């Protein structure tokens, strides 16, 4: 791969977007790619938006990219997909967790949660929507939702030479390694059903 590829990961604080970016970066580095990563935490500790950008290729000169430049966008919450859609290029792939987190204003009834987030993305982009949060709960730990979603997106990375399951096993803490391997496999399987 000579050209640079870019992935935008978006979610709400505490959902694990940064862990996904670390898994990606570790895998690409092991495969010999030049990798750059950036993180924006915002008000993450208060349920605010979190985004991280990962770029990989033969030579990457900077970690940040602009609107319309992401080849892949991973949204750990479906409203975040719509919020950051302008960063995805027209031929890009959106991988979305079909899950809603209600902000304080929505939970209080002051605002309504927007309808049709996934449908809006499907009109404009190739979209893989999986119930990653539900799958994680079925696996016994809702915190592994991020790895479920990573599994759903890994085939879109276009790097079949990388053993992503092994990278997950090497990146996550040992005490949750088996859970995260199951989460990765479940996410990959869910995405294959969407294709």
Give each language-model segment a name.
Residues 1-195:
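Active-site cofactor/cluster-binding pocket
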């Amino acid at each position: 791969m000579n050209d640079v590829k870019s992935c935008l990961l978006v979610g709400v604080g505490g959902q694990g977007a940064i862990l996904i970016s670390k898994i990606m970066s570790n895998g690409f580095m092991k495969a010999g790619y030049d990798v750059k990563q950036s993180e924006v935490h915002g008000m993450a500790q208060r349920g605010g938006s979190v985004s991280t950008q990962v770029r990989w290729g033969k030579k990457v000169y900077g970690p940040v990219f602009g609107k319309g430049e992401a080849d892949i966008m991973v949204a750990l919450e479906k409203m975040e997909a719509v919020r950051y859609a302008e960063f995805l290029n027209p031929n890009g792939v959106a991988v979305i967790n079909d899950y809603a987190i209600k902000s304080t204003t929505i939970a209080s009834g002051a605002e309504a949660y927007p309808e049709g987030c996934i449908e809006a993305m499907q009109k404009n982009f190739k979209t893989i929507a999986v119930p990653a949060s539900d799958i994680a709960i079925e696996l016994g730990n809702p915190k592994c939702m991020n790895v479920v979603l990573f599994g759903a997106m890994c085939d879109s990375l276009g790097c079949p030479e990388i053993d992503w399951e092994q990278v997950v096993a090497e990146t996550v803490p040992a005490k949750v390694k088996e859970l995260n391997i199951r989460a990765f496999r479940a996410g990959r399987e869910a995405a294959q059903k969407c294709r």
